[in-house]
Amino acid sequence: MEAVVVDAGSKLLKAGIALPDQSPSLVMPSKMKLEVEDGQMGDGAVVEEVVQPVVRGFVKDWDAMEDLLNYVLYSNIGWEIGDEGQILFTEPLFTPKALREQLAQLMFEKFNVSGFYDSEQAVLSLYAVGRISGCTVDIGHGKIDIAPVCEGAVQHIASKRFDIGGTDLTNLFAEELKKSNSSVNIDISDVERLKEQYACCAEDQMAFEAIGSSCRPERHTLPDGQVITIEKERYIVGEALFQPHILGLEDYGIVHQLVTSVSNVTPEYHRQLLENTMLCGGTASMTGFEDRFQREANLSASAICPSLVKPPEYMPENLARYSAWLGGAILAKVVFPQNQHVTKGDYDETGPSIVHKKCF
């Protein structure tokens, strides 16, 4: 039985058999609907409550996570109780040791897996483009991770995490749309879809500031029939990544953060890191973002200009969205056949802490 790879993000869960040249077979929202009794209504009335197991990259509700994985592995992947296989999880930057152990415990004690491995998303994303060294800029739904990787090892002392991401950009977009469409009530799920359809980046800061009244308005009809107009708001979403003050943050833009992160690594690696920069995460697919990032990089004060890695032609489309999963599929083809993973015997002998010795 082929190993399964799972990349559980704050917004989407990606899962599937480890096939490195294909996209994950399952991509679904990382949320569960929980039915709870409404004490106020009485008569045993039940209401639905949406639960998010993963918040800003980390598992926060383990019961919901167990239910979600149960659905994924048995109802979708095709596992059968008593005949579970091997599994590899992707792991976000700065995952606490306790969470790694809890995941291993869940897999061995609840799902009875025959083998377990987890690896950091930054390393896996680079594997997806054939690199073992480079720097990843991962713009996820709930966080931004910047991680230099040298010879397959994340340089944690130089890495950075920001607790902002696609969800914060969605909220910003909603606020801006409300200003120009004050009579329209827009559901946040509609705003999310509008962001994916319309949000983009200006060529540079000067171009952004010049947009103003010259921006061609787009009229969009919402599912409920309301009509909204989208103008400069579509550019504000992307601009916030380069000018964080738009989000109310006193921080430098994303390119500056990349350069300062790499500057904290041993100088001999600077060129290798900056010249193998990889953008990943759903927000990295925003129209114009890659071009704007490279333009800003060309203007940076760094002695070595950051340049973006081009994905191999044989890799699936939307590599930025699925890079960690694809890298996991590549790694699974190595660690499990070569017995580098945590086995059931390892777990029974040592307990959950074995993951720190065998997974890196």
Curated annotation (Swiss-Prot):
One of its GO terms (cellular component) is nucleus. Gene3D superfamilies: 3.30.420.40, Actin, Chain A, domain 4. InterPro entries: Actin (IPR004000), ATPase_NBD (IPR043129). Keywords: Chromatin regulator, Cytoplasm, Developmental protein, Nucleus. It holds the Pfam family Actin. The keyword Signal does not apply. Its main location: nucleus. It comes from the Eukaryota. Disulfide bonds: none annotated. GO terms for biological process: anatomical structure morphogenesis; chromatin organization. The keyword Cytoplasm applies. It is found in: Nucleus; Cytoplasm. Essential protein required during embryogenesis and all plant development stages, probably through a chromatin-mediated regulation of gene expression. Belongs to the actin family. Plant ARP7 subfamily. This is Actin-related protein 7.
